[in-house]
Amino acid sequence: MGRLAERFPNMSWIIAHAGGSYAFAEEVASCIVEHPNVYAELTLTPVTNRVVEYLVEATDDEHVLFGTDAPMRDPRQQLGWVLWADLPMESKGKVLGLNFKRIVDRALRP
């Protein structure tokens, strides 16, 4: 992903299932730190305790995106992982939708 992010710096890259394991979350976080156009999407978070907090702390609250994996997973559970995360409400708002809105708004600019 890093090579693609470098090659296409004006494109936003979203890595899905970033919460699937601690090892993968670490790889994703490293990629985000090196490439500001890369984002972590939070599906599969129920399998890793505190991964939402880890990704925000390892990167920032501007590069983490909410995801549900619905209909495979109950979206209420996925929402709960963010709502109960030990993060400021402002960060939760960014993760739950403001970050994605910013990406879409930027992509729609002429």
Regions found by a protein language model. Name each.
Residues 58-63, 73-110:
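Mid-to-C-terminal alpha-helical segments outside catalytic/metal-binding sites
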Residues 18, 45, 72, 89-90:
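A generic helix-loop boundary/linker signal
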Residues 1-65:
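Catalytic pocket-lining loop regions of alpha/beta-barrel enzymes
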